[in-house]
Design a protein with these regions (language model features):
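Short, well-ordered strand-loop elements centered on a beta-strand within folded domains, enriched
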Residues: 217-230
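Active-site-adjacent alpha-helix immediately C-terminal to a catalytic or transition-state-stabilizing loop
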Residues: 4, 62, 70, 145, ...
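A general structural motif
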Residues: 1, 50, 75, 172-174
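Short, cationic low-complexity segments
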Residues: 229-237
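Phosphate-coordination/substrate-recognition cap region in phosphate-metabolizing enzymes
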Residues: 40-131, 137, 189-213, 236-237
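Short, well-ordered beta-to-alpha junction loops that form the rim of enzyme active sites
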Residues: 10, 55-58, 83, 114, ...
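Short coil-to-beta-strand
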Residues: 2-11
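Loop-to-helix element that buttresses phosphate recognition and phosphoryl-transfer chemistry
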Residues: 11-69, 79, 144-160, 201
Length: 237
């Protein structure tokens, strides 16, 4: 048997400000640090031995994972993949969600956030928030850097990297992935065979480890959030 632990980063600065963040590299807040510490202590209480750690390229995911590893007193290397990044919100990047609801209507903003294949307008490549203009992405081929993404686009890149680098490890090891709301939703769609309607309802809380145990046939035998007080509904389980 093996384990996969999925952790959405602790609250970020732009989570607090209610802004569309996407690929912008913001840090976590004080509350986010506390969430990461609690996640680490919950994992410590489970007495788990994590064999492999993965994170996106983004600071909020890496900082969350570093705090968790410090609490676990584990010095194993973190493997970073940009494909685990948050969904790119295109021209919505940096905008306040409530202001967009007032401007476009709540239903339209909900569609942008939750629909499967709807992409927001592209983010201008001259915009300071565009990934092409951020140092952390300078080694990614420019033709692979998106201007906008749907959840389907996010799913495709996340599952491609999961299949290539992580899936085989999960068969016989305990793996922890620190990522983002939409990249974790993509993984949940794949692992739990969710349809497009189910994935639109799935909420991923910040800083709460999702514990997934597999049997020897790679079937899920157990799934739960470690922090019951902050658990969201697991619509599929």
């Amino acid at each position: 048997m093996s384990l996969l632990i999925l952790v959405r980063h602790g609250q970020s600065v732009w989570n607090l400000e209610n802004r569309f963040t996407g690929w912008v590299d913001v840090d976590i807040t004080q509350k986010g640090e506390e969430e990461a510490k609690k996640a680490g202590n919950l994992l410590l209480k489970e007495k788990l031995n994590i064999d492999y750690y993965f994170a996106s390229f983004q600071l909020r995911a890496k900082r969350t994972l570093s705090i968790i590893k410090e609490i676990l007193n584990d010095n194993k290397e973190i493997q970073e993949f940009w494909e685990l990044n948050e969904r790119h919100y295109g021209a919505l990047t940096g905008l306040n969600k409530d202001e967009m609801k007032a401007k476009l209507g709540e239903q339209k903003v909900h569609e942008f956030r939750r629909s499967w294949n709807l992409r927001p307008d592209k983010l201008d490549q001259n915009n300071s928030h565009h990934p092409r203009n951020l140092d952390i992405y300078k080694n990614i081929p420019k033709d692979l850097i998106p201007d906008t993404e749907s959840l389907e686009d996010t799913y495709n890149r996340v599952i491609k990297i999961y299949d290539k680098h992580i899936r085989q490890l999960v068969k016989k090891n305990n793996v922890l992935i620190s990522a983002h709301g939409n990249s974790i939703r993509a993984l949940c769609k794949f692992l739990f065979k969710l349809d497009e309607n189910q994935i639109s309802k799935l909420e991923i809380p910040t800083g709460n480890p999702l514990y997934i145990r597999f049997d020897n046939n790679e079937d899920i035998s157990e799934c739960r959030y470690l922090d019951n007080e902050r658990a969201k509904d697991l619509v599929v389980f």
